[in-house]
């Protein structure tokens, strides 16, 4: 059912049947370390490049999710996946052995939200019994692609965020579980003209604000109708900006807001500056922390809003602004 300007409410809500998370060593040392399904001994995952390591994480996450659901790849109708690298090579190489029909997606760090939205639409529309969603990011591969090789040892400003080395995989289907996707709000591109690639939180906060408000308008809800409103990776800088933007529009989500980039690392002892980011940040946190809280009934309804800064090395070097996008996924206990 179409809701408002940008949202869909599902009459037959798809379920998140199972999920899995794979992360690197630093993430395993953070507050959620014991909750992840797999923590690498180092960030190479037995490979000889950062990019291959990221593909290995995706492969492991998919296999773990399928194993936990007692399924084979043949039970999946379509795969929706993405990462931060050029042409989505981490995903292509990571899932090729599964031989599942695939949609390769790019929404920067919002890709997990985009993928979950599309997968749930397909299931709700009857185009398949089960879909597989997977996204990933890697600190080493992202730094090499968008900033500087690690061996360069450049200084990072305090507004910079630490790209999470991690992957999350989710099986979205018709079989009942304790978490269902009851609706989605598809985000718009929001551009405030910012150009600082070392301050991604500021670039993404306006898009998060836009989607959160639109979700409440489309579904005719208030902040208190959600136990948590969870953004993907605004970090400490972006969260502060989000609160200011929401306040200007007479909304207050302070008491209910959580950010995956602020949750996955311990700011006081891990020196990640403004927090975590990356396609794997929201995905791994969703699998390891958010879904269990919903499944247990601790949270009854959550608005999950992965956020992305839409830039490339070319657009940045040509002086283009960095617009943001955010997709809202309504998750409910059942």
Regions found by a protein language model. Give the residues of each.
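Short, well-ordered amphipathic alpha-helical segments that serve as non-catalytic structural scaffolds
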Residues: 54-70, 116-118, 203-218, 285-290
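A generic, well-ordered mixed alpha/beta core segment in the N-terminal half of proteins
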Residues: 92-144, 148-159
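Condensing-enzyme catalytic core mediating Claisen C-C bond formation in acyl metabolism
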Residues: 1-51, 149-213, 218-221, 252-271, ...
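Active-site-proximal alpha-helical scaffold in enzymes
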Residues: 105-133, 170-172, 277-299
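Conserved beta-ketoacyl condensing-enzyme motif
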Residues: 16, 50-109, 225-240
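Short glycine-enriched loops at secondary-structure junctions
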Residues: 22, 81-87, 137-138, 177, ...
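Short, well-ordered, mixed-charge alpha-helical segments that flank or form enzyme active sites
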Residues: 88-89, 139-144, 189-193, 311-313
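Short glycine/threonine-rich loop-to-helix capping motif typified by GTGT followed
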Residues: 92-95, 234-249, 314-321
